[in-house]
Amino acid sequence: IEGIENLNTEKVTNMALMFASCSDLTSLDVTKFNTANVTTLMSMFSNCSSLKSLDVTNFDTRNVTNMFYMFNNCSGLTSLDVTKFNTAKVRNMYSMFMKCSGLKSLDVTNFDTGNVISMAYMFYGCSALTSLDLTNFNTAKVMDMCFMFKKCSGLTSLNLTKFNTAEVTDMSQMFNECSALTTIYASDEFVTTNVETGSNMFFNCIKLKGFIEYNKNTDKENYKYANYKTGYFTKLVGKNGDEKIGATGETLATDNLVLDDDKDFVAYEPFAAKAASYSRTMKEGTAWATLCLPFEVSLQNQNFRAFKLLSADDVTGTVELEEIEGSIAAGTPVIIKMKDGATKLDFTVANKEIAKDVQTAETANGNYQLQGLYTQKEFSKDTDNNCYIVKGSKLMNPAKLLDKTTTESVGSKPFRAYMADNSSAPAAGARMFSISVGGSTTAIEQLESTADSKAEYYDLQGRRLQNLQKGINIVKRGGKTMKVIIK
């Protein structure tokens, strides 16, 4: 269309059907359009199926209330930038992107949908989309979601955790023929209380699995199964690195939780795991380490002993540990001592509760504590001067290590613990922890306050011991003597 860039649209309020069914158009320049007064863009580009590109980034949509069918059947478009759209007043998004089958990506994260009442057919037939971020959608006023995602055959998952469907009356064929869809994340706000019709909602979602699997329940395809307790939805309960953790059932449970030192673990709420695992390989010669896992660990037939911290005194050089019997409670930070040169931790458990938060293990007087970690921690010389770690054979806190040496960073991997001095005047440099240095980040790996090849052990009668024993031990190491009590 020649000269369209010279069209003065300053006073136009209605652009409905403006280019509708211009199916032979391959290009269209609307970058100079003034849309400040436009209230409806209904079907503006509907059935412009030959358009290869369309630039609407300059559209001022602050007054638009209707985007019904706006880009319907623009099947030739592979990309469309609507990130600058102001949709605060829009009430109708019915079929807005329907049959945009060539779109490979679509960013609607900036859409304000607080006033939208219809999202029916909105993404129907967007078969080339492999992902769609709707986490900012406000659906509190939406009444119609029928056919919303029908034939979005490229989508493998949908995160609808922000969807509030209390006003929705029609969910018919909402996910119909989403044949690649494996997971739909939804919260307790996705309800069907007012739904009047919701037939074929999950029809032909052949890979979908929530509490039940579609392929084993093909007769269950209506809105009654739009939940995570008995149906096809999944509740988002946490993240494991970049991976979402989903759980289903009346008692929330995830199928398999595989924890890894390179992945931060965050739980949004307590849940259970049908299977959970964690492993760690330590350097040869490691005697002591720390551990904090979100599931219970049995101590039966393990290659380590586990201890809780009873007391610690930097001034007198006294530490007191008490051996844990039976099991380590979920989320509890502990000190462990490897047996017989073992360097591998390997846990595989079944049907365990997962603790949302790490526990704090304080000494009796509250002056010291073991703080567990589910996530990586980077220590600061300004705010972590009460935390105690060790570099090589020197026992230092992170503040000293960062301030007095060339070390640029000191950190801990997940599923470990560090000691903190909670007293009103923390003593710097408590000789409690040993760490190993690798790469650019120092990672807490061991608790070797007393046990290494250079240490000598004696009982109270002065008799030399081969290893630390239960009771009172006198330990000499590097010109320092300390009393260690192990219960």
Listing of model-derived features with the role each one plays in the protein:
Residues 17-21, 42-47, 68-73, 94-99, ...:
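Short beta-strand elements of solenoid repeat domains
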Residues 176, 199-204, 331-338:
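Extracellular/lumenal glycan-associated surfaces
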Residues 1-13, 23-39, 49-65, 75-91, ...:
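Structural signature of tandem-repeat unit edges
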Residues 311, 440-487:
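C-terminal outer-membrane/trafficking sorting elements
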Residues 299-313:
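Short, surface-exposed polybasic-aromatic patches that bind anionic ligands, especially phosphate groups
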Residues 203-249:
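Extracellular/surface-exposed low-complexity segments
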Residues 238-302, 323-394, 406-443, 485-487:
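A short, polar beta-strand/turn micro-motif
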Residues 102, 182-183, 233, 411, ...:
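Polybasic, low-complexity association/targeting segments
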